[in-house]
Design a protein with these regions (language model features):
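Short helix-coil boundary/hinge micro-motifs
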Residues: 1-226, 256-257, 263-280, 284-287, ...
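Short loop/turn segments at secondary-structure transitions that flank enzyme active sites
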Residues: 224, 242, 253
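Cysteine-rich micro-motifs
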Residues: 230-250
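Extracellular/mature segments of secreted proteins
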Residues: 244-245, 255-257
Length: 321
């Protein structure tokens, strides 16, 4: 029996998928930072998926109506390409692959299961957009620290009555298939055996509420990030292309630069440093003398930072050193 497993481990989320149902050696084994799958789903352009899903649905329809195996193969090829766009879409491939294989073995096309899967394919473009809107609304009212505050439990309790949202545009939680099993050496964890994309969305949202994790838009890139560390964090550590700085790294440098640019002691030091560095090219000072001076200038700057000497005394020293 096929499976799509999802579980959390500290600041990570892990997915394992297998169309044959073989435990321990899944065909897909992926790891992301915590909440990354939900955040990238929220950012995904679902409109691009609509024509692809429509083609897959048409080919699946021909398969179950006419037993057109070529159409079924074409549907599976497109599902295989589609799954590379997002980890949630792996579920479609695994589930449809399982059914396509069983259909070939037993020749039981046209079953109620096939019709249900066809209906799901046809409805999926609209459903994906709906899920995105519901997640965004949940962020606005429950998880976004800047609009909803720092207590997701309190906000969730305020916005839900029993198992129903007070606002119909909010995500609706339902029972999900959770297990509990070893996931790492010496450690067990709740594990979601997902039957649908909403299951994975549900598990991510409820886990944030249970763990008291809020989200915030990054001050640099504008994307959401989970506040798994300091709730005052303004810059994200979302994945970036190899060789690029994360927003948190870039933000720390920007903050340091701004702080230094507003510091009169640093400005005085920097002005004299640039002037004397230019003297090297002009031949007025040697490299050795320049670096010896800069070392003394930094020591004097530290004294000024500690108020051992005044700014005026430091500026005077720089001019006469």
């Amino acid at each position: 029996m096929w499976y799509v497993k999802m579980y959390f481990s500290e600041k990570r989320e892990l997915f394992q998928c297998d169309a044959s149902g073989i435990q321990g050696v899944p065909s897909v084994d992926r790891e992301f930072p915590f909440l990354e799958s939900l955040l990238t789903f929220l950012e995904m352009d679902c409109g691009e998926l609509t024509p692809i899903l429509q083609r897959i649905a048409d080919r699946w329809s021909r398969l179950i109506a006419e037993f057109d195996r070529d159409a079924g193969t074409e549907a599976m090829v497109e599902l295989g390409q589609l799954k590379s766009r997002h980890i949630y879409l792996e579920l479609l491939y695994v589930r449809w692959y399982d059914r396509f294989s069983r259909m070939g073995i037993y020749g039981d096309r046209g079953s109620a299961e096939d019709e249900q899967m066809l209906a799901e394919l046809r409805d999926l473009p609209e459903q994906l957009l709906l899920y995105q809107k519901q997640v965004q609304r949940f962020f606005d009212l429950v998880l976004d620290v800047d609009s909803a505050g720092r207590d997701p439990q309190q906000q969730a309790a305020k916005n839900y009555l029993h198992d129903s949202p007070r606002d119909p545009s909010l995500f609706r939680f339902r029972p999900i298939p959770l297990s509990f099993e070893p996931v790492e050496p010496g450690r067990c964890s709740p594990v979601l055996y997902s039957a649908s994309i909403p299951d994975m969305i549900d598990y991510s949202l409820r886990s944030c509420v249970e763990r008291g994790i809020t989200v915030r838009r990054c001050k640099n890139c504008g994307r959401y990030f989970p506040q798994t560390g300091r709730v005052s964090a303004e810059y994200c550590e979302r994945p970036v292309p190899r060789g690029q700085q994360t927003c948190r790294e870039a933000g720390a440098f920007q903050q340091w630069t701004k702080k230094q640019s507003d510091d009169p002691v640093f400005k005085a030091y920097r002005k004299e440093y640039k002037k004397r560095f230019a003297w090297i090219k002009a031949g007025r000072i040697s490299d050795t003398d320049f670096y010896a001076w800069s070392e003394r200038a930094r020591e004097m700057k530290k004294k000024c930072d500690r108020d051992v000497i005044t700014l005026e005394e430091y500026v005077e020293w720089l001019k006469n050193s």
